[in-house]
């Protein structure tokens, strides 16, 4: 069920009401059951995949914490286990999300050499939310490996962390240091708090407004313009580009706001995902404000893992480029998104090289590059 559906408008108040009626010790179980019901309402079979990702990372984290990091051999074994776990989770994501893209790319290359294409009909549906909850689980696993988080012993609590229904479909991508820590803190008694619940509902209402009143309405302009671009002049195409920029922001941020508001009514604080990104003064700052949970995830687990800025300048630039290419592939399984990610990586590299010039023209530059990048 979508947030902006009648089903959710029935589901959420029922979950909230029962949550505050049942005893505190029952509430996590109730939220877990509600989260799986919410997720499996799309496709019950996909619940098995969610459970598999949860089980693999839960067991992997427990095993990682048992190992002694002081001894060299144990440290090597620990790294091997981490790599195996990461490959297993990415393999599940890749099978559903990237197999079709991989086969199509192979066939394009084969066609260049006039070789018969690989004839495999690929029509497996992509499990909704898989791009989000796999990153949540992988982030937790890597945090345990790095010693930044304790492995969770309670499987049901960890399963709730991965599947928490407000954020499983569209984020924010949660961290063990935030949401799991809140789930672990038994000292917090989440009793009915009218002020907090009212604040959560107001946040949700603002999200619904952005989605239903702005995003869905302005999408008509963007879709019409780019559906038949040959029918429009320069002004019409510029209006379409601006409309698309507004649409994608309002559409995506609306889901994050609804998630934040829903979690808040239940007594949880999720990561804020957007901080007025179109007011950023540079491309780098834009990505510090746009889809913050993804940007920080890629920074912490991809960019830093490759060496981050603790290496030569050109190695650092390579790390930036690869990180944004990964971001592009995460957003969509096709060459357009891959190039889109590389394009934003190049923007950041050029900004670093031309920082003195960029500071003078950032008011013009960041708007144009962001608009062009999204349309591309």
Q: What is the predicted function of each stretch?
A:
Residues 1-376:
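Membrane-embedded transmembrane alpha-helical bundles that form the catalytic cores
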């Amino acid at each position: 069920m979508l947030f902006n559906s009648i089903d959710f408008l029935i589901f959420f108040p029922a979950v909230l009401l029962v949550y505050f009626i049942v005893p505190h010790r029952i509430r996590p179980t109730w939220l877990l059951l509600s989260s799986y019901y919410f997720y499996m309402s799309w496709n019950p079979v996909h619940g098995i995949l969610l459970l598999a990702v949860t089980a693999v990372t839960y067991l992997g984290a427990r095993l990682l914490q048992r190992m002694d990091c002081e001894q060299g051999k144990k440290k090597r074994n620990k790294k091997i286990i981490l790599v195996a776990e990461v490959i297993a989770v990415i393999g599940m994501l890749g099978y559903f999300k990237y197999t079709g893209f991989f086969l199509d790319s192979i066939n394009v290359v084969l066609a260049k050499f006039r070789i018969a294409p690989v004839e495999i009909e690929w029509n497996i549906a992509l499990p909704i939310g898989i791009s989000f909850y796999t990153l949540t689980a992988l982030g937790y696993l890597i945090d345990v490996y790095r010693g930044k988080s304790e492995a969770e012993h309670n499987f049901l609590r960890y399963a709730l962390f991965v599947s928490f229904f407000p954020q499983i479909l569209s984020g924010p991508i949660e961290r063990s240091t935030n949401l799991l820590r809140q789930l672990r803190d038994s000292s917090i008694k989440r009793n009915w708090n009218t002020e907090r619940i009212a604040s959560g509902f107001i946040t949700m209402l603002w999200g619904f407004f952005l989605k239903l009143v702005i995003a869905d309405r302005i999408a008509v302009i963007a879709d019409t313009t780019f559906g038949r671009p040959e029918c429009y002049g320069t002004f019409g195409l510029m209006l379409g580009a601006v409309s698309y920029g507004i649409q994608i922001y309002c559409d995506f941020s609306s889901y994050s706001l609804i998630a934040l508001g829903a979690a808040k009514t239940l007594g949880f604080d999720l990561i804020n995902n957007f901080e007025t990104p179109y007011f950023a003064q540079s491309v780098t700052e834009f990505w510090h404000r746009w889809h913050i949970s993804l940007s920080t995830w890629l920074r912490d687990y991809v960019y830093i893992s490759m060496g981050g800025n603790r290496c030569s300048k050109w190695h650092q630039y390579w790390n930036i480029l690869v990180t944004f290419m990964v971001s592009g592939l995460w957003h969509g399984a096709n060459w357009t998104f891959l190039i889109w990610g590389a394009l934003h990586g190049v923007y950041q590299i050029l900004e670093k090289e031309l920082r003195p010039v960029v500071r003078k023209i950032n008011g013009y530059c960041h708007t144009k590059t962001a608009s062009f990048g999204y349309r591309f």
